[in-house]
C-alpha cells in the first residue's frame, strides 16, 4: 500500500509523453499537480478538458491544472523535469526561480542529465530517475500510453533518504512497482548501454521488436 508522508504539490516541467503520463496518474490519484509546457494549445486543452490517457494500458481523462513557463507563479518543493535531454539546461534555468530552497528536481528523462541539473540547482537538490515505459504525445491534451515498465528513483550520492522513499511512494500512484535504489547510476548507465545497441534498428529502419 502507498503511504505518502509528504503530499506537497508536484510541479511537472514538460507535459509530453513522460510528464503527461505520470502527471495524469498523479492527478487522478488526487495529488496536487501542476503541469508546465511550452505548447500553449496543450496547456489550454489540459485546463479546459483535462488530460486524456489512452492505449493498451489504460483509458481515462482527468482534470489537471497547467501553465506555460511565462504564466507560472509560485515556488515548489517537488519538481519532476520531463523534457528532452537537449533541453535540460534551458529548462532547469527556467524552473530554478520556482524551486523552493528545500526543494528538489527529479530528472525523469532519457539520458544522463543529473550532472547538468546539479550544476544549476546544486547536487543536494538533484535526484535521479530511471524510466523505461512506452508513451507518445499525440496532440493537445492527448497521450498514448503504450507499455508499463520499471520506475526507479535514487539520490545521486547513493543514500536512501526519507525524501527518496516518499518520492517512490508518490510514483507508485503511476507505477505500483516503483522502487528506490542506492545505485541509480547503475540503472541509468545500463539503459544507456542498451540504447547504444539500437543503432542497428536505425540503420535498417526496423522496429525495436524486430
Where do the PLM segments sit?
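NAD(P)+-binding Rossmann beta1-loop-alpha1 motif at the extreme N-terminus of oxidoreductases
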Residues: 2-55
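Residues at the starts of beta-strands that form the adenosine-phosphate
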Residues: 9, 32-34, 104, 125, ...
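Rossmann-like NAD(P)(H) cofactor-binding subdomain of soluble oxidoreductases
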Residues: 36, 60-142
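Short phosphate-engaging motifs
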Residues: 42, 87, 113, 159-163, ...
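Internal alpha-helical scaffold of NAD(P)-dependent oxidoreductase catalytic cores
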Residues: 98, 120-125, 138, 142-210
Amino acid at each position: 500500500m502507498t503511504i505518502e508522508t509528504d503530499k506537497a504539490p508536484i510541479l511537472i516541467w514538460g507535459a509530453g509523453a513522460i510528464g503527461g503520463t505520470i502527471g495524469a496518474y498523479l492527478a487522478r490519484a488526487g495529488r496536487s499537480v501542476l503541469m508546465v509546457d511550452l505548447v500553449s494549445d496543450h496547456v489550454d486543452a489540459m485546463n479546459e478538458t483535462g488530460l486524456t490517457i489512452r492505449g493498451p494500458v489504460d483509458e481515462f481523462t482527468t482534470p489537471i491544472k497547467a501553465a506555460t513557463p511565462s504564466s507560472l507563479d509560485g515556488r515548489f518543493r517537488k519538481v519532476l523535469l520531463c523534457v528532452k535531454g537537449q533541453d535540460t539546461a534551458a529548462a532547469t534555468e527556467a524552473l530554478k526561480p520556482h524551486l523552493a530552497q528545500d526543494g528538489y528536481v527529479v530528472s525523469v528523462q532519457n539520458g544522463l542529465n543529473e550532472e547538468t541539473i546539479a550544476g544549476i540547482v546544486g547536487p543536494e537538490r538533484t535526484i535521479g530517475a530511471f524510466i523505461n515505459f512506452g508513451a507518445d504525445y499525440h496532440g493537445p491534451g492527448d497521450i498514448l500510453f503504450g507499455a508499463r515498465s520499471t520506475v526507479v528513483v535514487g539520490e545521486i550520492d547513493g543514500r536512501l533518504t526519507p525524501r527518496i522513499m516518499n518520492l517512490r511512494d508518490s510514483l507508485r500512484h503511476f507505477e505500483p512497482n516503483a522502487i528506490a535504489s542506492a545505485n541509480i547510476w547503475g540503472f541509468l548507465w545500463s539503459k544507456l548501454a542498451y540504447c547504444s545497441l539500437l543503432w542497428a534498428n536505425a540503420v535498417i529502419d526496423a522496429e525495436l521488436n524486430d
